[in-house]
Amino acid sequence: MNKQKLGQFIFISCLLLVSCVGFAQNLTIQGSLKDSIANRALNSATVSLVYAKDSSLVSFSRTNEAGAFNFKNVAPGNYLISVSYVGYVPKWVPVITGTEKTVEMGLIYMNDVNTMSTVTVTARRPPVVINGDSVEFNSENFKTAPNAVVEDLLKKMPGMEVDKSGGITVNGKKVTKVFVNGKEFFTGDPVMATKNLPADAVDKIQVYDRKSDQAMFTGIDDGSEETAINLKLKKDRNKSTFGKLNGGAGTPSVFDLQGNVNVINNDEQLSAIGGANNTNRQNFSNRNIINFSGGGGGRPGAGGGVTVNFSGGSGETDANAQGIAETFSIGGNYSNIFNDKKTEFNANLSISDVERNNISSSFTQNLTPGNAFNRISNANSIAGNKQQNFGSTIDHKVNDNFSFRFTPSLGFQQTTNYSEDSTQTYLTNGNLLNSNTTVSSSASDAVNAASTLLLRKKFAKKGRTISSTITQSFNRSNSTGNQFTEQLSYINNKLSNDSILDQQNTRKGENSSYSANLIYTEPLGKKSLLEFNTYLSKSIGSSSRRIFDRNNATDNYDLLNTRLTNEFNSEYTYSGGGMSYRSNQKKYNFSTGFSLQKAVLDGENISAKTKLSQSFQDILPNATFRYNFSQTKNLNVDYRTSTNQPSITQLQPVLDQSNINRQSIGNPDLKRSYVHNLNIRFFSSKILAGKSFFSTLNASTTNNSIVNYDSVLPNRTILTRPVNVDGAYRINGSVNYGFGIKKLKSRLSFGLNAGLNNNISYANGLLNTIVTKSTGPSMSYAYIVDDVIDINLTARYSFSQTSNEVNPTLNTNFLTKVFGADMTNYLPLNIVLNQSFNYAINTGRAEGFNTAIPIWNASFSKFFLKNKRAEIKMSAFDLLNKNIGINRNVSQNQIVDRSYNVISQYFMLTFTYSLQKSGLGGGARPGGMIIRM
């Protein structure tokens, strides 16, 4: 049995094994709810079934119009039933099952709080409370492992899914914001909260649809909303200090150190983190601020194609990352609310130092008509990246009608790079055409300062508002570097020429930008309004690139290469205004409007002593429509238009040969691109049944799309130049359906995505159409038994077909299959065993790049000391030692298959100690956090 069949056999066997669990459950518990005074049935009340021994949730449902409920396929045992209804006192009823197949609970009467003289508040609360489209889960009914984080708790919630990167979906809808006690945690990154806060610190998880800031400001629903989660902390954690210290080391020479502390004093929160590792764990996202373009405009398109990145692995270590990184980072976040709750303040600081070692090899098939060739490349590089970033937000409410928000930021960056690259180019008959060896180095630094001021004013009349946003930014970048290239040229495999390129370069870029807008809304009745807006934006930049050739006489780089040297000043100005109409009805809301935009570019090429001036005027219409079939079923249609202006780099007719194999030159005749985009989304869910259906359709077309015009020079160097084309469009769609299987304590999800991209480009002077069709079905299965076992199975297929009109030899078909299995066993003696298996298979690539990659990771944890504060873990990454990195890129004239180094097999022993001190005392379990990104 080969590796591919073995992996598929293991995956299917696991699925069948799990599917056989739990079929012995055959009891039914049923009853009905009524008002104790009016004797009327209570429709849509929440009924939860929990285990009597520990209150962990078994299932939950809602009553029908007759007030009836039932739970099917329940195992014999002792239970409690919780019933809750808005305006009524919650109630708990014990259930003891025997040998009967149906347990009749009869009538359960509930008391209206308004008819009672006194209400006794008990410590036991309902596991689930539903109010409209919001759901509240009580954490005490969901069991997690010792020292679990919020992410582990969310995985236990009905209808919630958490992917390996930490992304959260609730019944198919992506969660975009996570709040802690109503405030965003650590600059609003939801992953920071769910991956780091301890699960036992959370009292309630509240899930709701959050309206847009503009809708909350005007009071008129604009149809824009996002799914949000609020984590309400336990009372004793509102005044507490908690954190975690983690140290791990292993073979071969791997280490992972992390530490953090959180201090919460009601509204005041302070978090500090630090870490160092060489396992490709990145604690902060990279924010590249280096910019030599002088500002303005967009970036060149590649002329169409598809890119597939492919490697095995899963878990905290980034197995897919190219290269091996050694990372050091520290950071902090402070937030507080003061001045009688009128002022919210947040500040954060992050410092990181990353050094990445990259080793790669590639095989390029360039199939340009009349100039086809193959190229083999090998490259080694060491790249360093240091960043220091500070950000802050001050949100002040002057009174009920006027507020402002000020957001300053400051960032610094320093980079170094050293690379060695060797390339051999062969004709299609196998003869060697040339061989290049390049050694290059560079050092760069940059500073970026920005600020935004938002002013908001409400008037007495509801819906009448005025707001303004003023922004400012400044960027300065500097770089110096050296490049040495030796090119050996051959004729009939015999050396014909040996040329040397030995240069030093300096680059400088500076950009200042300012913008302001003004928005006024005027209500039309109670459910509609008109919005008027105007804006002005200006960007002033300068760009300098000076190239010096080596002077053999002086052995210095003092010969200015005027052909490659360029200095340019530019000024971009955007201005315009528009209006829109919004209406919010009971079942639907819609908006329609337009804006007028004028863009003016003035540029001066100091080196060539030439000037450039361009001006564009556009009308940009937009429209949105939302229809609510019910609180959990809706249809959204969104139409937008936008423009992309050419960048200064794209407009300058100056040669850039920093890449000896692919050189570029700008085009001063470029026009702006005009984009039409249509997005349709349908969503339906049944929260209690755990069912969700979600589908999307996105279509876009671009006029004057900016693509690359590639020409092949006699030595097979590619010269690329941006040009405008029409006819580019793309259509993408997806369907997802998920449902819970209460009998198996499981959830099953299916997905399908498909796409059609029609790209226009030029293949060595010939207008070319590249059509890419793609489709990909997927499936996931989750099986969870509290304190016993968690199992997650996934399968994903991805098929892509590319056709090339001018050059059919570039037509490609390739298939990627990925199977995954994750299992966590909670064993006696406070032992936890975790395993993950990923099996990735790809076909349709160049020889040597069709691989099957099985990745098996495992860990063994033991918790000890009082309250399980300490953990010792033995973990193994890539037990089979099979991890590799592969990348395929299909563009307008070539196919590039590339392999690169990735993190390989290692074994690590880790010790973790949790810190926790509660200001109010109490018996809460100690918690902690370990920063995971």
Model-predicted segments: where are they?
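Short, ordered, surface-exposed loop/turn motifs in non-cytosolic proteins
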Residues: 37-51, 130
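A short, solvent-exposed loop/turn motif at the edges and junctions
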Residues: 51-56, 78-94
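Surface-exposed extracellular loop regions of Gram-negative outer-membrane beta-barrel proteins
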Residues: 223-245, 354-380, 384-397, 401-428, ...
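Outer membrane beta-barrel strand-and-loop segments of large Gram-negative receptors
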Residues: 378, 513-515, 559-566, 665, ...
